Amino acid sequence: MNRYILIPEDTIRVLPPEDGAEAAIEIFCSRTVIYFEIAQVRDVCLMHNVLSNRRRVDALCFTAADRLLEREQMVLVPTDRADYAAFLTDFRTYAPETLDFSKEEDYIPESCDHNGHHHG
């Protein structure tokens, strides 16, 4: 599973349901756009001690398969982003009732970057 921590240059927003399509999360990172169907989000929690922009912050973490490749991804959205509050409000609006937004965990970085380097 890929992990992705949003950087300040990325944008994230919730697209409401429209023309038969379900609500989705849209992420612009660099020149790439990634979509996640909100109904397909498998898990959500608040992660503590995520390294973002050279600081430790909390981040909302969600796990879901992206719409294009249908590969499961773990996405971390730092809570100190200017667009975080609006994103969280919209995400909760369209999230399935089964998602538990009260869960919290400590972030454990990967020990391998999949390029032959091992950390920790």
Question: Where are the predicted features?
Answer:
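Anionic N-terminal interaction surfaces
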Residues: 1-22, 86, 93, 108-113
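Phosphoinositide-binding peripheral membrane targeting modules
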Residues: 17-50
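Short, flexible active-site loop motifs that bind/organize anionic cofactors or intermediates
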Residues: 2, 31, 74
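A generic structural signal for ordered secondary structure
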Residues: 11-13, 24, 41, 58, ...
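Acidic, Ser/Thr- and proline-rich intrinsically disordered linker/docking segments
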Residues: 43-120
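Glycine-centered tight beta-turn/hairpin loop motif at sheet-sheet or coil-to-beta transitions
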Residues: 7-9, 29-31, 67-71
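Short polybasic amphipathic segments
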Residues: 3, 23-27, 59-63
